[in-house]
């Protein structure tokens, strides 16, 4: 049976036969205490534990001394321990400083079995540094055993390519040194991790700069949005003032008006009276007032247009631009006016003998557009989308006029049918 031990003096692990542990006869693989300190001989080959190799003379391997060590695992043979170490199944506890004491003994290291050596990396140290120090320890022991006189400037890595031709254990020495492949693999992994860390730091710095730029742009965008809203308010107020100064229609030459009749035609007079009765329109210029103010149960929409307060609140919960525009047109003009009007005053092309109807008041159409604009501006700030949705106002009002005329015709048919019965 073999034991995987860790010597406390140099924190190096070896796979040794259990016969190297003094006063230790395990009955199973779990019959040990990993917190207990055992006395272990270093150099199992010199103890003659192997049945096929006879014991050597003291002049060949020197006097062996006991060393303090911890047993980390037991196995039936060395290959099981090797597989457990490579698969990281053996947990190595932290080294306690209480176990490491100065005993005053002169330690003479014999030839170690280094075929399976596990280097425990201390916290905060690089893998290459740990392997480098372990190689230095191997060089020191080889100097003491073989009488080599290596200078302090000798690189520990030369042990991999240098060998002592006079020793009998040339093959065992090549197997005993820490595998160069393991050292190079650890070094490559460390360099790869350093490269990945450098890339991550560069990516982090690039992301931080992008966030700073986006924050600046967002701040500028917020300032532009506030400025645009302020300009919109000023534009609407300017439009109200201009519409009040111009009156209900386009500018008219006063000299022509005086030379012609002073009173409007009966048809126009009736039209003005209808609009006045339905939407409370005040054609006379009035002081500029803010929009959407309440007064005596009515809401001011601008340019002297007033609508019922209750109907206005019901309109605000209407879904969709089409329904909102149609209901607002009914509130401003009324169904009686809309059924006898057209949006632009141009006769339809569907009928050859169609007579054009009077157009709707341009300034009232502008009020409808402004109300719809205020509604859309609460949903989006995209000017392209706002312009696209506002361009459909005439279409919505035209559809409403057609619906009113259609319902009137259906009502007339029902009445005619009822009279015939």
Swiss-Prot record:
Modified residues (N6-acetyllysine): 133
Transmembrane segments: none
Covalent link (Glycyl lysine isopeptide (Lys-Gly) (interchain with G-Cter in SUMO2)) residue numbers: 258
UniProt xrefs under InterPro entries: BEN_domain, BEND5
Keywords assigned: Acetylation, Coiled coil, DNA-binding, Isopeptide bond, Repressor, Transcription, Transcription regulation, Ubl conjugation
Gene3D superfamilies found in the cross-reference section: BEN domain
Protein name: BEN domain-containing protein 5
Gene Ontology annotations of biological process type: negative regulation of DNA-templated transcription
């Amino acid at each position: 049976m073999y034991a995987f031990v860790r010597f406390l003096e140099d924190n190096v692990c070896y796979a040794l036969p259990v016969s190297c542990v003094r006063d230790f006869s395990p009955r199973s693989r779990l019959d040990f205490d990993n917190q207990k300190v055992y006395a272990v001989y270093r150099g199992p080959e010199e103890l003659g534990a192997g049945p096929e190799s006879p014991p050597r003379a003291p002049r060949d391997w020197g006097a062996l001394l006991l060393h303090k060590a911890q047993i980390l695992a037991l196995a039936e043979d060395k290959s099981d321990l090797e597989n457990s170490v490579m698969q990281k199944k053996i947990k190595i506890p932290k080294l306690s400083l209480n176990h490491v004491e100065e005993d005053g003994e002169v330690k003479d290291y014999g030839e170690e079995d280094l075929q399976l050596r596990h280097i425990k990396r201390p916290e905060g140290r690089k893998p290459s540094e740990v392997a480098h120090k372990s190689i230095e320890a191997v060089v020191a022991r080889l100097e003491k055993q073989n009488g080599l006189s290596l200078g302090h400037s000798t690189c520990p890595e030369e042990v991999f390519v240098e060998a002592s031709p006079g020793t009998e254990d040339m093959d065992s020495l090549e197997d005993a040194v820490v595998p160069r492949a393991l050292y190079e693999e650890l070094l490559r992994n460390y360099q790869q991790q350093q490269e990945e860390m450098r890339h991550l730091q560069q990516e982090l710095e690039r992301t931080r700069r992008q966030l700073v730029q986006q924050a600046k742009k967002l701040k500028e965008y917020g300032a532009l949005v506030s400025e645009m809203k302020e300009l919109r308010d000023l534009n609407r107020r300017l439009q109200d003032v201009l519409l009040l100064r111009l009156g209900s229609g386009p500018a008219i030459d006063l000299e022509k008006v005086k030379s012609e009749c002073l009173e409007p035609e009966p048809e126009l007079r009736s039209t003005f009276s209808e609009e006045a009765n339905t939407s409370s329109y005040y054609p006379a210029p009035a002081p500029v007032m803010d929009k959407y103010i309440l007064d005596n149960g009515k809401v001011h929409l601008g340019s002297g247009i007033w609508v019922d307060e209750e109907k206005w609140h019901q309109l605000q919960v209407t879904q969709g631009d089409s329904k909102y525009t149609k209901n607002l047109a009914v509130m401003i003009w009324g169904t009686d006016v809309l059924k006898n009007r057209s949006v632009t005053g141009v006769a339809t092309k569907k009928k050859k003998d169609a007579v054009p109807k009077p157009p709707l008041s341009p300034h009232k159409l502008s009020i409808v557009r402004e109300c719809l604009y205020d509604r859309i501006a609460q949903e989006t700030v995209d000017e392209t989308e706002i312009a696209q949705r506002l361009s459909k106002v005439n279409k919505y009002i035209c559809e409403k006029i057609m619906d009113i005329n259609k319902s009137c015709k259906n009502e007339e048919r029902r009445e005619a049918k009822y009279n015939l019965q």
